[in-house]
């Protein structure tokens, strides 16, 4: 089924509102195996909408129109579709009853004739009830093309799509997806490594997406059941993770989790809870961002004891009992300082882990280190590990954000090695 989405509304063309409905519809249609080939926006103009309907009817088997179902003069979607199909507009009894109730409960509201238009549908259409508004939607098939009209406000469109439209469009197959999350490898390198799989993909498919500090891979397949989809996605996932970087490192080492909402922080927090271990932090350039990220999750008092924000040399010495002369000798941006910060954070809070971050967020260099230089220390019973990462060419906010991601990844690896 080839689908086309037509957004009706001059306010979209003038930039007054963003057409989020198209993104939502495309995503939900893809989940049930319906491919969207075209997205178009047209103003509140009958002639131009008629022209667009003529084009859409020739190239698409499902035409979805959003917006223009309200009571005002420029709400002309249903009227124009009826004219295009040579059909009349008729009243939907359920929608009329909803109008009756609405105005009965609001005696101060004037029930003007134009309000009645919201209860009309194209003759022969299946009504799509509006759970949160008054304008009824509709679904109609004519000459092999299915036409759907939906309200423009997302608060009305979304429940109508989820509860009314999608169940009526369901076919034998659906689109199933799996998201793999990678940290420590760039999108360009990952795409180069997976070039053969990407170039030769048919079904399942894979698509890379770069995000701040990480890369995700979306694996998708059309199948009649979750079990059937899992078989296909498992094969593709193993093919991906069996690949190696140019240095011979397996991609499995970079894949940290699954899903749209998963993050390095959520993985670490859950693993700390599972293992019953605690962590403390001492932060300089990130100014408490690691600690704030941990405490964004609920019920973390069992794993997070306390922390330190030691932005200046003096506070590193005072709060963490690191001799000032040693800090001056080695520099605040150094392996030594990261090591001592982590060890003192762990010792002072009696935690299983102590994590530290010190570096140069920018915009200026510090102690001869370029912007983006970060030292991260992780102290635990077995000893202390310090890594140096270079996060160059980024904004100050991105340097801090990615540094925290590196810190969580360091903790994650330590937890997995236990």
Swiss-Prot record:
Annotated S-S bridges: none
Pfam families tied to this protein: CinA, CinA_KH, MoCF_biosynth
Recorded family membership: Belongs to the CinA family.
This one is known as: Putative competence-damage inducible protein
What is the scientific name of the source organism?
Answer: Streptococcus pneumoniae (strain CGSP14)
């Amino acid at each position: 089924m080839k689908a086309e989405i037509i957004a009706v509304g001059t306010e979209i063309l003038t930039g007054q509102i963003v057409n989020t409905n198209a993104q939502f519809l495309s995503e939900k249609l893809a989940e049930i195996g319906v491919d969207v080939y075209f997205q178009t926006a047209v103003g509140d103009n009958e002639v131009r909408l008629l022209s667009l309907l003529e084009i859409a009817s020739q190239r698409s088997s499902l035409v979805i129109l959003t917006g223009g179902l309200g009571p005002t003069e420029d709400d002309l979607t249903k009227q124009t579709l009826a004219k295009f199909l040579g059909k009349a507009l008729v009243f939907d009894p359920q929608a009329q009853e909803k109008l009756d109730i609405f105005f009965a409960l609001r005696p101060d509201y004037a029930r003007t004739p134009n309000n009645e238009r919201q209860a009309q549908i194209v003759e022969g259409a299946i009504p799509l009830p509006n759970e949160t508004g008054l304008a009824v939607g509709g679904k109609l098939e004519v000459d092999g093309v299915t036409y759907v009209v939906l309200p423009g406000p997302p608060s009305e469109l979304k429940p109508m799509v989820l509860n009314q439209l999608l169940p009526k469009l369901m076919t034998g197959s659906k689109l199933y997806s799996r998201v793999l999350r990678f940290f420590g490898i760039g999108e360009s390198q990952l795409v180069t490594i997976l070039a053969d799989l990407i170039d030769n993909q048919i079904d399942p498919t894979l698509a890379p997406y770069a995000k701040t500090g990480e890369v995700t891979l979306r694996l998708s397949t059309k199948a009649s059941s979750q079990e059937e989809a899992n078989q296909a996605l498992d094969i593709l996932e193993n093919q991906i993770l069996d690949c190696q970087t140019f240095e011979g490192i397996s991609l499995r080492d970079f894949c940290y989790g699954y899903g749209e909402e998963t993050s390095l922080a959520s993985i670490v927090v859950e693993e700390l809870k599972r293992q019953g271990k605690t962590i403390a932090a001492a932060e300089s350039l990130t100014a408490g961002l690691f600690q704030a990220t941990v405490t964004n999750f609920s019920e973390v008092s069992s794993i997070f004891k306390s922390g330190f924000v030691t932005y200046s040399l003096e506070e590193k010495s005072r709060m963490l009992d690191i001799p000032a002369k040693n800090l001056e000798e080695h520099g605040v941006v150094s392996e030594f300082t990261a090591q001592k910060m982590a060890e003192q954070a762990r010792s002072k809070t009696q935690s299983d882990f102590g994590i530290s971050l010190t570096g140069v967020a920018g915009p200026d260099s510090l102690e001869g280190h370029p912007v983006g230089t970060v030292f991260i220390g992780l102290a635990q019973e077995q000893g202390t590990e310090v890594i140096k990462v270079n996060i160059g060419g980024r904004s100050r906010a991105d340097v801090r954000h990615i540094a925290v991601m590196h810190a969580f990844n360091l903790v994650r690896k330590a937890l997995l090695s236990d």
